[in-house]
Amino acid sequence: FKEKVAIVMQGPIVTKDSFTYETLKIYRKRFPKISLILSTWNEYSKDELNKFKAINVEIIRNTKPDYSGISNINFQIESTKNGIFKAKELGFKYCLKTRTDQRIYRHDFILFFLSLLDIFKIENKNLRKRLIIASLNTYKYRLYGVSDMLMFGHIDDMFKYWNVSFDKRVLKDVEMGVSALEYSKACICEVYLCTEFLKKINYCISFT
């Protein structure tokens, strides 16, 4: 494919079976010309990260936010946002956001994602393209709770989604109720990310 694509992998490095490293090795072998960005934490030494640099992985060593947020949402925001910003800074047009504990085995997944964006056009002046997300962890009755595990799209749309303020609320102060609707309206975690994004593109959030 001719488009400039970056893969942003965010989160703590999974050292068991060298999972994160081996995943990036697979991506590097499969896609020698794309950018691989590992957005992780500054708790790892430069020596620990040298093997990633040896396979031409761009490393971002982030400082963890003072407050992790509910279910570590602020950690995810920080590492993802900074990784996507680096891809944007380097001039990449498209970006895949994935996690350090996940691996995609399909050999042509980048081309598949690009084809989906080309086939399914979007008419929204506030977005360049659609955003592709995984069905895994996307639930029918959790309104606006799209999965945050994997996302692919135009770099501008991706940055718009993840360039969000930290959620400073603590769980004990959040009224979540007992129904799926009440939980959704609490706007925590995935719902927080999605609803904040929808506000930016002037979408009416109705919880219906």
Residue ranges and their predicted role:
Residues 1-18:
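N-proximal low-complexity "stem/linker" segments adjacent to membrane-targeting elements
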Residues 92-103:
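Short beta-strand-to-loop acidic/aromatic patch adjacent to the donor-nucleotide binding site
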Residues 3-5, 28-38, 57:
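Short loop->beta transition adjacent to catalytic acidic/histidine clusters or analogous donor-positioning motifs
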Residues 39-90:
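Active-site-proximal specificity loops/subdomain of glycosyltransferases
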Residues 12-17, 43-44, 102-105, 157-159:
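Short acidic, S/G/P-rich loop/turn micro-motifs used as interaction or catalytic elements
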Residues 18-21, 47-50, 71, 105-111, ...:
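A short acidic (Asp/Glu
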Residues 104-110, 114-208:
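Catalytic core and acceptor-binding pocket of nucleotide-sugar-dependent glycosyltransferases
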Residues 14-29:
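Short, well-formed alpha-helical segments that are part of the catalytic scaffolds
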